[in-house]
Amino acid sequence: MSFSDNLVKILDKYENLGRKLSSGIIGDEFVKASKEYAELEDIVVKIKEYNKVKSELEEANNLRLEVALDNATLEMINNEIYILENLLPKLERAVRISLLPKDEADSKSAIIEVRAGSGGEEAALFAAVLFNMYQRYAEFKGWRFEILAISNTGIGGYKEASASIKGKDVFSKLKFESGVHRVQRVPETESQGRIHTSAATVAVLPEAEGVDIKIEDKDLRIDTYRSSGAGGQHVNTTDSAVRITHIPTGITVALQDEKSQHKNKAKALKILRARLYEEKRRQKEQERSDSRRWQVGSGDRSERIRTYNFLHGRVSDHRINLTLYKIDEVVKHGQLDEFIEALIANDEAKKLSEL
């Protein structure tokens, strides 16, 4: 089916759904039609704008062919054609992007997990910096940032930390943050002024609902134990810490941040559900195409995606060769949009090239 035929088909379907909704249907049929109608609304607006500009361009080109045109009128028409010819490809691209297969998880909230990698205490300090950066970004976007768990090192670093970030389309914005983030800086404990390189791993998971992943009680092993502090000492006299193991997959989540065993269990189940949902999505994507990448880069958590160089004040994303000399804005204030928008645009361009 050609691009034009596809647009006609979408407009026809939209109009038919509109007539159906106006005919007085009720119940499940009405709910289904309303959902489909709402899903098409955005692309229909773009198609109509594209068709309008395309028609105006054709009219202007036909008008230019008329013989009896004075110079002023001809210049005005040529200017209009110039504007329309520049606008039309942009509108067409917007339509084509809207036609791309949607990631069903894009509209979901997300769970972010940050873990210290190679580099010892400096890596743990960097993990804390990254975690706080995402918290600032969530605040900037108006999302709700709920800390699920933090494993402190005792001097401000995080061995690992996780949070739930709730809001519209959170996962679509943050999914490209998964991977290895590297830092180059002089640690505060470095007396010789030598630059150290360390790393932290970020994983972004779509927050799954019960309808996305069903977990059977028989598939879970739940262990409770006393929570411990950074030095290993017990900090609670009750068995409030929880470890949940999903027996079929072997995935394990342990939580001890809350004093309440019930709260730790609820948070652990939320993380477990997200990890199982992500594994389900990964397997589904692999079955669809072993060769095609569905994210910028491989989406592999072992892939080095970004370097933060404090000495030169720069942040470099290696997947799209973008370097910004504004490390304070990015790290301290969570100004990540320039990276995220470029990553999304690059991903869309790759997908368009595969059509």
Swiss-Prot record:
GO cellular component terms, semicolon-separated: cytoplasm
Record's function text: Peptide chain release factor 1 directs the termination of translation in response to the peptide chain termination codons UAG and UAA.
Keyword set, alphabetical order: Cytoplasm, Methylation, Protein biosynthesis
PTM characteristics: Methylated by PrmC. Methylation increases the termination efficiency of RF1.
Record organism: Rickettsia typhi (strain ATCC VR-144 / Wilmington)
Domain of life: Bacteria
Gene of this entry: prfA
GO MF annotation terms: translation release factor activity, codon specific
Residues carrying N5-methylglutamine: Q233
InterPro entries registered for this protein in UniProt: PCRF (IPR005139), Pep_chain_release_fac_I (IPR000352), Pep_chain_release_fac_I_sf (IPR045853), Prokaryotic/Mito_RF (IPR050057), RF-1 (IPR004373)
Primary location: cytoplasm
Family: Belongs to the prokaryotic/mitochondrial release factor family.
Protein's name according to its UniProt entry: Peptide chain release factor 1
